[in-house]
Amino acid sequence: MLTFAGMAINQRCRPRSGRRPPLAWARPRIGLQPLGSGGGARYDTAMVQLLYDAGALLGESPRWSAPEQRLYWVDIEGRIIHRTDPVTGADEVMTLDEQVGCVAPRAGGGLVVAMEDSCALIDNWGAAPRPFGPAVLAEKPEQRFNDGCVDGAGRLWVGSLTSDKAHPTATLYRLDPDGSLSEVFGGLTTSNGAAFSPDGRRFYHADTPTHTIRAFDVDPASGTLGAGRIFHQFPLGNGRPDGAAVDAEGCYWSALWDGWRVVRLSPAGELIQTVELPVQRPTMIAFGGADMQTAFVTSAGKNLSDEERKAQPHAGGVFAFRVGVAGLVQADFAG
């Protein structure tokens, strides 16, 4: 066991290929909706595989490491960082003493992590986290860090969420490689869906309870945002936008909490593809594999009734399916 500033880390290797089901676990329908008017929707059959039956309380933040060919992801409420081999199903875990909202590889090796009230660096797998940047949420016990992504300049954009839903005081921040932390904008409840276009000139963001994804022009060099605009508005009662990723064609993929699916939106914000999943609460999508054409989706298994759990026995698992367009290779954190 490693200890650091009151934080304990248990490192163990758990090859879990024995819990991996047959590859043809599920064959949900993928609905492809035409961009223009005229013509009917066509449907293809895709295979969604249960990659890892983790039973996570709140699986989140999948990030592919190309050098390692491993998927990093977290169970926020389980206080666990996972490193999963999608080929063998083997899974390694680091167990922390506080929640971890998101994780990303670093350019020099190791990880950057957003903990409950501050960010930290992990120099190598199993090493103790060391603080990096100010503990900006230390005096805000109703908040914790949540979703994040790294831009092309190696900066981590990370937002918070608040448990006080009546007062939207959560904030999106930008962590620079030198450890400085800047406030980007506030007035949020649950910061989610952070992603960048292929050229780095458009930033996407969702405040989950609003059912809205917004797009912002961004200066890739300075990280300065322009005014935001509505990119896509989801109807009430059919899922809310959670974590996201962008593919090589500039399409934005969003996991819909309470929506049983992930969707693909064109650069114009039009719904062009829906992938149905066997879980109610998919949380985030990432692309990986040797050709970047495997989509990985984390999910949540918390707060389900017995009846709901019976209908989705693999809630909290990590799922995978193949895509026709490769995902973007995300930059690593430069700090």
Task: Label each PLM-derived region with a short phrase.
Residues 48-53, 89-95, 130-138, 180-186, ...:
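A short beta-strand motif characteristic of beta-propeller blades
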Residues 65-66, 71-76, 112-117, 156-166, ...:
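Conserved beta-strand positions in repeat-built beta-propeller and related beta-rich domains
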Residues 125, 216-223, 323-327:
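Short loop/turn segments immediately following beta-strands, especially the blade-tip
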